[in-house]
Structure formats: C-alpha cells, structure tokens
From Swiss-Prot:
Record family assignment: Belongs to the NPR1-interactor family.
Protein name: NRR repressor homolog 1
Chain coiled-coil ranges: none
Pfam families registered for this protein in UniProt: NPR1_interact
Ranges for region Disordered: 1-40, 66-183
Gene Ontology terms describing biological process: defense response; regulation of systemic acquired resistance
Location in the cell: Nucleus
Amino acid sequence: MEGVDVKAPRPGCGGDDGGAAAASLSARREEEEEGAVVGGEDEQVERFYALLANIRALRGMYSRYNGEEGAAGGDGDGASGRKRARRAEPPWRPAFRMEDFEFEEAAAGAGDDDAACSGRTTKKQRSGGGGHGAAVEKRRTEKEAAAAAAEDDDDEQEGGEVVEGKEEHRPGRRVEAHGPTDQ
C-alpha cells in the first residue's frame, strides 16, 4: 500500500475535518444543479432550432404543393415571390390648371359668366360676398340704404362728404355719404 495515503479521511467515515467534507459536498451539488440548468437551456435551444427547421420544411412543402417554387427564387418563400410578380402602380401625377391657382377676387371678377355657365360656383358666390358673412351683408345693406337715400334727395344732393362708420372703425377706411347729414 505504498500509493495510498492511510491518514486521509474517507468521505462519509467521519474524520478530523468533517466540516471541509460537508462544504465540498455542497459545492459538488451546486455544480450539478448548475449543470442541470445549463443542460435545460441547451435542450431548449435545441428544441427551438428543431422547430425552425420544421417550419422551413413545411413552408417548402407548401410552396411545392402550390407550384410557387420558381417564383420564390429557391428560398421557399412564396409570399415574396407574389410581391415581385405584382406590377408597380404608376406614380400619382395630378394635372393642374391655372384656374386652380387663381385668387377668389380675380376668379369672381373676371369669370362670373364662365362660372355661371359651367354650373360651378366660387366660394365668394356661395357666401354671398367676400366670405365674411354678416359683416359683408351689413355693409351691403348700408350701401343700398345710401343709394336709396341718394335717389330720394337728388335735388338736395351736395358734394360728397366723408363720414367714418360708427361700429367698425378701421384706420384708413372711410365711407362716402350721399346726401345731407344733420350735424
């Protein structure tokens, strides 16, 4: 028994160093558990790649069954083959006319007859004026009233007098009154 150390304690027999033996056993168990975890991860990775291989095989079988192998380009992807076979739509190129870029005032002033004949109405014609609704309508009635007063008082009409409006005071905006004023 030359090569055997007689003084070395045997595991499980109890010896002088019982705590060291227990520590080595717990370390060995931890290594086995880590190995099992790593083995479980390896098994999951292998199952994942097997699943991918099965999916590729099924796609290949499907494309061969439907006759899409040539259109797929050999990679077994029938969907991309259909996309390549589809014709591209031409780009959208709208046709513009100069009428599309004219201002409302120019279109209403110059093309009233054209708009009436073609059945198209401009925004100005639809709103009944300049597009400001009630304010435009109010100005129109004031002008009509002034014109009616001018017709009644033709004999007494004096030179045009400049009068400022009471409700809408805008600098530089003046209204010419027809007829005499009592002030």
